[in-house]
Amino acid sequence: MERIPSAQPPPTCLPKTPGLEHGDLSGMDFAHMYQVYKSRRGIKRSEDSKETYKLPHRLIEKKRRDRINECIAQLKDLLPEHLKLTTLGHLEKAVVLELTLKHVKALTNLIDQQQQKIMALQSGLQAGDLSGKNIEAGQEMFCSGFQTCAREVLQYLAKHENTRDLKSSQLVTHLHRVVSELLQGSASRKPLDSAPKPVDFKEKPSFLAKGSEGPGKNCVPVIQRTFAPSGGEQSGSDTDTDSGYGGELEKGDLRSEQPYFKSDHGRRFTVGERVSTIKQESEEPPTKKSRMQLSDEEGHFVGSDLMGSPFLGPHPHQPPFCLPFYLIPPSATAYLPMLEKCWYPTSVPLLYPGLNTSAAALSSFMNPDKIPTPLLLPQRLPSPLAHSSLDSSALLQALKQIPPLNLETKD
């Protein structure tokens, strides 16, 4: 059985060591023992301090995050609306920071530009200080401009003194126009250039009217020409000219009028000529022209003797379009016997539009019911030649001696 040393008394054989007193222990060093004990207690205290430090650190981190979120929310509210619309949906924190940075850069660039302009203005004022002469010149220019403006305003108000609805906008427009004229230096040229314009507009309708008349301008549907008269028939053209038909003008336009005169067979009229024909001719259809046919003797006379006469139809075998009512001025009454003998086998009725007595004498022996409507000539202007009472009386006597004209028609 093993011995337990603590339970057994010390052996007697061993010498008894003297006991240590408190005074002897005062000089001994126990530092190593103290350090070991101290280190054990420090470890326990550091663990406790970590546990106690975790709680305020969490609070501090939470407060820091709260401050960051609050600042981002304020930046989001301060951002312009056009920057907010660039992104769709909810604005994240990173997006808010990016937009804020972009906006700050734009503001910085704007501020830099403004500062550069301010510096340029300051340097310009410092480099180019106005001297006394420059100030006087500027004052003189200002005074002259003010006087010019005041003069224009007074003139404009004087011109429009009677107008009640005068507006300030009209005055401002007038001043702007005057300033532009002064700057361009063309105040004297513009009235000269603008003056002929109304004349052009006034002349334009007459030109259009002339062009719209077409080739049928001088065409008379009652009396038609086929070709130019010969040299021996100048009296007929003179009579036509004196009657107001414009024979001299028809001589020059004869070639251009021939296709329109020859269109009697095919009825190829232009629009303007058709309108003039409707106004001057009767409304009878072309088939009723057979009522106007003359006797065989008269047809032979038309085809043989007077083929070149300008008062007959276009074709020698075609019956004449109308009876030969010639318009002769009163001064030509001396040639009546020659006309009766040479031009027509019987008496020729003479009619002058300017004389009412001749029309009365003609109506005395002519029945107006028997006269077809195409035979009535349109009223023309009187002859420019002055006719005396002697001529009119001679013409009246000649008309009274004319026998009634045979107007019976064939079926």
UniProtKB/Swiss-Prot annotation:
Q: Which organism is it from?
A: Rattus norvegicus (Rat)
- Tissues expressing this chain: Expressed in heart, spleen, lung, liver, muscle, kidney, uterus and gut. Highly expressed in the cerebral cortex, especially in the fifth layer, thalamus, superior colliculus, olfactory bulb, piriform cortex, hippocampus and hypothalamic nuclei.
Residue span of region Disordered: 1-21, 186-293
Q: Where is the Orange domain?
A: 142-175
Q: Where is the region Essential for interaction with BMAL1, E-box binding and repressor activity against the CLOCK-BMAL1 heterodimer?
A: 1-139
Any one Gene Ontology cellular component term annotated for this protein: cytoplasm
Lineage of the native species? Eukaryota, Metazoa, Chordata, Craniata, Vertebrata
Which compartment or compartments is the protein found in? Answer: Cytoplasm; Nucleus
Q: Which gene encodes it?
A: Bhlhe40
Bias kind Basic and acidic residues: ranges? 248-271
Report what the protein is called.
Answer: Class E basic helix-loop-helix protein 40
Q: How does it assemble?
A: Homodimer. Heterodimer with BHLHE41/DEC2. Interacts with TCF3/E47. Interacts with ubiquitin-conjugating enzyme UBE2I/UBC9. Interacts with HDAC1, SUMO1, RXRA and BMAL1.
Q: Which GO terms describe its molecular function?
A: bHLH transcription factor binding; DNA binding; DNA-binding transcription factor activity, RNA polymerase II-specific; DNA-binding transcription repressor activity, RNA polymerase II-specific; E-box binding; MRF binding; protein domain specific binding; protein heterodimerization activity
Q: Which keywords does this chain's UniProt record carry?
A: Biological rhythms, Cytoplasm, DNA-binding, Isopeptide bond, Nucleus, Phosphoprotein, Repressor, Transcription, Transcription regulation, Ubl conjugation
Give the protein's biological function: Transcriptional repressor involved in the regulation of the circadian rhythm by negatively regulating the activity of the clock genes and clock-controlled genes. Acts as the negative limb of a novel autoregulatory feedback loop (DEC loop) which differs from the one formed by the PER and CRY transcriptional repressors (PER/CRY loop). Both these loops are interlocked as it represses the expression of PER1/2 and in turn is repressed by PER1/2 and CRY1/2.
The UniProt feature for the cross-link Glycyl lysine isopeptide (Lys-Gly) (interchain with G-Cter in SUMO1) gives its location as K279
Q: Which parts of the sequence carry Phosphoserine?
A: S235, S383
Please describe the post-translational modifications of this protein.
Answer: Ubiquitinated; which may lead to proteasomal degradation. Sumoylation inhibits its ubiquitination and promotes its negative regulation of the CLOCK-BMAL1 heterodimer transcriptional activator activity.
Give the region (Necessary for interaction with RXRA and repressor activity against RXRA) as residue ranges. 75-79
